[in-house]
């Protein structure tokens, strides 16, 4: 006991590594969280910028810009043609006169077709293939309105040939082929429609003939009356003059 009193007790130092602070690392978490918030805000800003760009309507080109683009396109086309012409002229040196003539005609045809396409594009006219895709060939009618529109286009297309001598035989053959698969009742309806149309046309034709005859008769009657009057004036017209001389 005395020995303990004589000796001074000094507690050993606790290593710094062994001390654990329960609040240690809290500040670091806050820093990480703040950096995440910053990243989220940046992403939101980028998304908003993209949405704004997408929502912004595209500006329509002015007439000046359109003309400028067409002029540039024309210059590029002329440059391409000049280069192609130069290349072909170099190739012509190796051809015979007959081959040169045939090649010249071929190139002329290509140029004409190219010019035609440019003109059609300028005036907004489509090719025949495009017209067929947007006309009867492209239509698949299913409703009453669609069939009505289809009928108008078909009639407009067919009636262009009604003055041709083969038009009536064509209609007969076409109607026969169309009606082959129909029921008798449906064919009867079509026949009734044609009969009604025939009756209306006959009535109109008779009325037109009757009106023409009445007009012609009135003209002839009026002409006869005028003829008799002129004849009387010619026969007795001098009597009045003689009476005046006598007086």
Swiss-Prot record:
Keyword Transit peptide: no
Gene3D superfamilies named in the record: Eukaryotic translation initiation factor 3 like domains (1.10.246.60)
GO molecular function: translation initiation factor activity
Composition bias type Acidic residues, residue spans: 24-45
One biological process term in Gene Ontology: formation of cytoplasmic translation initiation complex
GO cellular component: eukaryotic 43S preinitiation complex; eukaryotic 48S preinitiation complex; eukaryotic translation initiation factor 3 complex
UniProt entry keywords in alphabetical sequence: Coiled coil, Cytoplasm, Initiation factor, Protein biosynthesis
Coiled coil: 43-108
Main localization category: cytoplasm
Protein origin, superkingdom: Eukaryota
Region (Disordered): 1-64, 77-101
Subcellular location: Cytoplasm
Pfam families hit by this protein: eIF3_subunit
Subunit structure: Component of the eukaryotic translation initiation factor 3 (eIF-3) complex.
Family to which the UniProt record says this protein belongs: Belongs to the eIF-3 subunit J family.
Functional description taken from the UniProt entry: Component of the eukaryotic translation initiation factor 3 (eIF-3) complex, which is involved in protein synthesis of a specialized repertoire of mRNAs and, together with other initiation factors, stimulates binding of mRNA and methionyl-tRNAi to the 40S ribosome. The eIF-3 complex specifically targets and initiates translation of a subset of mRNAs involved in cell proliferation.
PANTHER family, per database record: EUKARYOTIC TRANSLATION INITIATION FACTOR 3 SUBUNIT J
Protein name: Eukaryotic translation initiation factor 3 subunit J
